[in-house]
A protein has these predicted regions:
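Membrane-embedded catalytic scaffold of the fatty acid hydroxylase/desaturase
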Residues: 1-135
């Protein structure tokens, strides 16, 4: 689901404008994005980054948890977002592809917005031919 939402956020003009702020805010490849107490309240960078996170990940996660009555997933997602995500997703030294679409994988997406949309698993990019080899 997040794969398709991520692709939509690169196509629909208003969503693209909001999402591309995330691409500009990331310290590309250094893994130096420090934890901030605001992350505990799911606030990311600025209002556009926060709207991006809520529309693409948080609200869909809440809906999924409600539909399937799997509220543990919301707790896991909160922990992931508040404490782990920035240290893995934007860290070029964290690479466990093809198991997970980790730091190196995601940073390729930041350089080329037409590839590597997957957030956790690269299988969706491989299936829909939007994967790009790591450099």
């Amino acid at each position: 689901m997040i794969y398709w939402l991520h692709r939509i956020f690169h196509v629909v003009p208003i969503l693209k404008e909001i999402h591309l702020v995330h691409h500009r805010h990331v310290t590309l490849g250094t893994g130096s994005n420090k934890w901030n107490w605001k992350h505990m309240f799911l606030w990311v960078d600025d209002w556009k980054g926060t709207v991006d996170q809520w529309l693409m990940e948080i609200i869909p996660t809440i809906i999924f948890c409600w539909v399937f009555n799997q509220w543990w997933l919301l707790a896991f997602y909160w922990f992931w977002t508040a404490f782990v995500q920035e240290r893995i997703e934007h860290n070029k030294n964290f690479n466990i592809y093809p198991i997970l679409s980790s730091g190196k994988w995601h940073l390729v997406h930041h350089r080329n917005c037409n590839v590597n949309y997957g957030v956790f698993f690269p299988i969706w990019d491989i299936l829909f031919r939007t994967d790009s080899k790591l450099d």
